[in-house]
Structure formats: structure tokens, C-alpha cells
Amino acid sequence: MDKEAVKKRIEELRALLHYHNYRYYVLDQPEISDAEYDRMLRELISLEQQYPEFITPDSPSQRVGGEVAKEFREVAHLKPMYSLDNAFGPEDLKEFDRRVRSLLPGQEVEYEVELKIDGLAISLVYENGVLVRGATRGNGTTGEDITANVKTIKAIPLKLRNPIPLLEVRGEAYMPKESFARLNEQREERGEPLFANPRNAAAGSLRQLDPKVTAERDLSAFMYAIGEVQGYEPKTQAELMEWLSELGFKVNPYREVFNNIDDVINYCQSWHEKRFSLPYVIDGLVIKVNSLAQQEALGFTAKSPRWAIAYKFPAEIAETRLKDIIVRVGRTGVLTPTAIFEPVSLAGTTVTRASLHNEDYIREKDIRIGDIIRVQKAGEIIPEVVEVVKEKRTGAEKEFVMPDTCPVCQGKAVRLPGEAAWRCTNASCPAQLKEGIVHFASRGAMNIEGLGPAVAELLLEAGLIHNYADLYYLSAEEVARLPRMGKKSAENLINAIEKSKQNSLERLIYGLGIRLVGEKAARDLAVHFKELDKLIAAGEEEIMAIPSVGPKMAASIKAFFAQKENLELIEKLKAAGVNTKYLAEVRDNRLEGLTFVLTGTLSSFTRKEAEQLILSLGGKVSSSVSKKTSYVVVGEDPGSKLTKAKELGIPILTEEEFRQMVMS
């Protein structure tokens, strides 16, 4: 390819990647699979590395993380970022309405109401449509320059779809609930301090001096306001939100306009329970005067706008009695104390246990068996013990002592210097083996259907397996003799194990359970090295050349493959016929021309897995039901999409019907 052809191809790839980024992260309507997107991004990065003169600040390649900063420099906002006054109930909202109307005598007032995302406020500046700066709110006048980090958030466009000379836009960076739970699970396994909630996780991720660390975290962002702007003058907040969406920003779909405060109050109260079904945390709603001319007339106090207020949800905390503290063992040997308490209802579910994380956590909070404790759900998803109600102690409470032996195998447990976690040192510990096998068989790894914790425990207790490689040497006859299995279940399990031999390399890499290596990194490693043997032979520098891999992960990968027993397991997998090479995606276009809408919770797939499956088979996924929708797939607790589908006469699929369509 000559230089002109290279330049043209780079521009074509950038345009395609910007388009598909917008479809996936903003519209929630992806048209291609992750694998196809990754292939285009790798081609772009490769071409830009060969021809660095063609790299531009708005290139999708610039999302992967730049140089490590020594510190964050301070930057001034073009216009101040104010905080909001709070309302804690209907009377506060009515008082806000009275103040607004008294300052706008004789005028009609509309309110635009939005969800209040619980994250980190950020400000972005675009010049001629290109992102040039990202900053934290800071003190409202100045903030910290986090440009390299915000570029890693794929919901933030590097280039606007309709460029204007200057735009300062404000929004909230956040971490989805599932991502927060997964991140804390990983940190707990590594003996690292946990984030208290998704807001802290988002803030901590964006304030990393190394952008590669931020890139590894699953962050997103909703935009909701502007500061300085040249080239556009919206008339209302509702119009502004539509315009931001047209520019390529992700804006929250849940927003309404009302002309009286009673309807505003009813709408706010309707979210008290509905919020728990959202994939992200909200801590209230924001009420804004809809007219921007009226906003300007109302102005600001020293701290906050007179035209907006935040309605805050009451904290949901329950008191209960701590019955016991048990210790569980994870796949890396980490001993985690767990609180067992009398049942309480939180965020719409009944809760009976919560992780106490480590010995230091218990000591800091002075938690004792028999205590009355206060419990909440961090990020509405993870139960946590907030505090002990010490004034209710009777003297019968018992202090908890962390065991220095593993509660499962009785092997020695140690706490290494600088770590908060105790670890079982016995590599043959049944608990570690079980968790390792369950991880190996999980959906994101080898996807062996029917091999969960109970079956893994049966296989280990019977002595049929001692590691995950042994799975490939099982017979249906052996498995059928296990309690509660039977011939049919045994045959299904063996068939699932046999089928997993043909998985692509990224699933195997993730299934090996290498510390710090998640699904995305496993895919990137597989695509880069193509063969497991090449990854094993690679040096740390070559591994670190992959955008999603940092120094700690590279060291962890090398340490894993330096262990003789791990290499022996890999040889055993090869001998059994397990694929160790990257398989290029084979196109099966059975769903070509079909558009699917998903509603409710699916039991066999996560939402993303179902979407990727549809895309990989040539179909499309939409976030809303219309006459163009081919099928609506319905899980548990479906929403209004099911009602709309029935009204339009759109075919409805149960989860089982969907499975048969895509898996047969």
C-alpha cells in the first residue's frame, strides 16, 4: 500500500470505529460483534504504528492509555461547575417551587426531571469538534486534568458527530453495578482494599496516574449540561439533551417534563423502588427549570443554581443481629471472613450474609459475633456491614479471631507483609481446586454447561478429578455413578466437556485463572499471540505492548507460566485435544436481516452475552421496540417493551425459544 492508500484506509477505519462506538456505547444498538470491532481497532493501531505521522488526537487508538503521569495538573473551567442544593422530601420540593415562581412572577414554569447518577462529575472541552481536555469538578472553578483517562471511556466521543467551534460539556462518569461487583471480587481475591461503592470506584479509576489502569476499568458516562458554547443556542433543557445525543454523547433516557410540582413529586417517588432494576446506581433525581432563558434570569447563589435542585433518596439501612462469622476460601487461596446475620430486606431482596473482607476490616469496625449491626447494599448490589450498634451490646458478644489454618484443608494460612488477606498455602486445597474448576468451566471461560460448584465438589470428593485438566479424561460411566447424577446428566456433562475442546484460545487463557487476567485481556492476548505456546514464550516487554496489559498483569502472566505444575496442566490439556490456538471468527449469518429487542432478566445469558450472540450470527440488537423489530426476547420481570411488542403485534420469544434459535 502506498502512503496515500494507507492514509485513506486509516481515515476509513477511524470513521467506522467512531460509528460503531456510537452505536454500541451511546445508542445501545450494536451492529457488529466485539471481535469485529477489535479486529478493526488492531488494524488501525498497526497502521498508525507504521505511519505515526497520520495519528490524530481524535483517533480511536488514543483511547488505550498514554504515558504514566507524575501528577495531575490543575486546569480552570471555562465556566464554573456549581453543586446543587438538596431536597429530602415533598416539602423541600414545594419550597423550591415557591422560590422559583416568586422570582418569575406571572410566568409559566416547566420542570425537566432527570435521574441523578451516582458517579464523578466531569467536564469536557471540544474545539472544532475534537476532544482537547477532560477535567474533574474540583472546587468548581478549577479541577484536575484527566484528559488521558477520559479518553479511555468509550461512551465519550473523541470527535463530535456535528462539530462546532467550542463546547464545554458536563456530565457524570460512573461504573455499572455489575462491573463494580466484578472489580471488588477481583480485588478481594488479590487481597487489595475494596471500593466502598461504585462512585468511589469511578473516582478512583479516573484519578489513576497510569491511563492503562483506567482503560482496564469498565467506566461509562452520561452528559447533562453545558458550560461555554459557541455555535449553538438551545432554548430548553429538554432540547439541550436531544442536541447532546445528536452530537454523539450518551444521555440518560429517563427524563420527563412537567408543568407542576405535584407531578414532579409523584415522578420522583415512583423511582424509590424502580431504581433497583437499573444497571447503574442513582442517588436521587435532578429537577431543573426547563427554559434556559428562565434559568439565566434565576441565576446562581454563591454555591448553587437557583433553577435546579437534587431530590435525594433516603438511605436504606437495616439493623440485624450478627449470628456468626464463617471463613470461605477462594480460588487463589484467599481466606475471606463472611458475616451471617438474621434476614433483612434491602434494595428489593432478602439478605442474610455479607463479606467482611479481611481481618483489618473486622478490627477497624470492632465487629463481634452477637452484635447488632447496620447493613446496607453498596451500590445497591453488594451487602455490606456499615457499623456496629455498640450501645446495644449486652456483654455476651464474642470477638472473632482469624484462623491461621485453612478451614477447609487445615493447611497453614499466612498473611504476607503488605497484604490485608490471609492465604491458604496448600496448592492442593479442595476449596481452591473447586473454585478453580468452577472458574475454568464458567460462561466467560470454557463454558461447560452443567459444571457448577455442586458438580465440581462431587467430582473432587469422588477422586475423579484433581484439577481442571482431568475433566477431559472423565467418562460418562464414572460420572453416572455419582450421587444425584444419573446416565442422562452424565452424558450431557461429558458432551459439554467434549464440545469445550473446540473453544477459541481466549476462553482457555481466561479459564486458566491467571491473576489479574480478565476476559478482555484474555481476548487481547489471544488475538496478539495467536497460539498459547507463543504467549508462554513471550517476554514481559512483548506482553506489555498489548494496550490492555499493564506491568503488574504482565508480571503475573510470566509468573504463572514459570510454574512447572501449570505447564504440566497445559500439556495435559493439549494431549486431551483442547484447542490452544486463536480461531478466526467463522460467520454464521442465520439471523441476518433480523432485529431483536431484549427485555427482562435472562437466566442462561447475561444481557451482553445475548447481544454478542445475536451480532455474531448476523442479527441486530435494538434498545427500543418499533415496527422494524423482528422479535422481542422476554426474560423474567420484563418491562414496558413487552407491552409495546404486544400492541404492535411483534413476535415474542421465551428464553428457551431464543436458545433454540441461536444455539441449535
UniProtKB/Swiss-Prot annotation:
UniProt keywords, alphabetically: DNA damage, DNA repair, DNA replication, Ligase, Magnesium, Manganese, Metal-binding, NAD, Zinc
Catalytic activity annotation: NAD(+) + (deoxyribonucleotide)n-3'-hydroxyl + 5'-phospho-(deoxyribonucleotide)m = (deoxyribonucleotide)n+m + AMP + beta-nicotinamide D-nucleotide
A GO MF term: metal ion binding
Enzyme Commission no: 6.5.1.2
NCBIfam families referenced in this protein's UniProt entry, alphabetically: dnlj (TIGR00575), PRK07956.1 (NF005932)
Family assignment from sequence similarity: Belongs to the NAD-dependent DNA ligase family. LigA subfamily.
Function (record text): DNA ligase that catalyzes the formation of phosphodiester linkages between 5'-phosphoryl and 3'-hydroxyl groups in double-stranded DNA using NAD as a coenzyme and as the energy source for the reaction. It is essential for DNA replication and repair of damaged DNA.
Protein name (Swiss-Prot/TrEMBL): DNA ligase
Underlying gene: ligA
